Amino acid sequence: MARQVGHHNNVDHLREVYGELHIAHGVVMGNHSLELRRHDYPTDLFHYCVGLDSSLLEDESRVIPDLPDRVEAHLRRDNCCGVKLYPGYNKIALSDPMYQPIYRLAARYGKPVAVHMGLTAFSRAHLKYCHPLALDEVAADHPDTQFVMCHFGNPFLEAAAAVVEKNPNVAADLSGLLEGRVDLDAYFREQAGYVFLLRTWLTAIQCWDKVMFGTDWPIVNLGEYIGFIRQLVPETHWEPVFFDNANRIYGLGL
């Protein structure tokens, strides 16, 4: 996928591109393994969120032995800045008992729980589990846990905006709103209605202290996506959206 958007999937390439585009740091949304050794990233470039995805579930029992202990081993690490959940793909409600210890651990360590919200890449996933209202429920029940709504719940923008505005412990990122290479001038012309809705709800809630830049790389070209978000977000809010909010919410210490 990286090659299709003009990139190479290796650290040297990303280091070069980060320098060219003045990207200070990245957060890797990890998946496929809870093994500590599988999450070895250059600390000058990346922090990571440890992911709990469907590949970790054993048969149909939805049981991961010692899950809280294994997640806590990551949260103890300085370079682990949170947890990533994929409820639509796992087909497990965010309110499921298996997740409750994870929310408490995240609160204890002061690290956020990022959640895939909105449209899924595979048709067999269940949207009801990744609708923004599912996040509202657990955010309200776990007020001491910081949550991040990934992809701004796209395309459920109205509900996403309501959940971010209502819950002080819910932030959102703007990753994954595009896919592939994009001619931005043509896109903003042809998708004017969609862009209008995005701008409308982002502007309506005025939660610019809780909205973060993100990419969902490698599905987008980094330079093009930065240009997309710059056209979407008013320039007066670029500093918090592109840097300050993520640095604070993920505790990056930059």
For the regions a language model picked out, list residue spans one by one:
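Mid-to-C-terminal alpha-helical segments outside catalytic/metal-binding sites
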Residues: 1-25, 199-200, 204-212, 219-254
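Divalent metal-dependent hydrolysis catalytic cores, especially in the metallo-beta-lactamase
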Residues: 1-7, 12-32, 46-53, 81-82, ...
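Generic structural signal for well-ordered alpha-helices
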Residues: 11-15, 34-39, 68-72, 99, ...
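Divalent metal-coordination and catalytic microenvironments
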Residues: 18, 26, 48, 83, ...
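Short, well-ordered alpha-helical microsegments
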Residues: 33-37, 156-160, 222-223
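Catalytic pocket-lining loop regions of alpha/beta-barrel enzymes
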Residues: 95-212
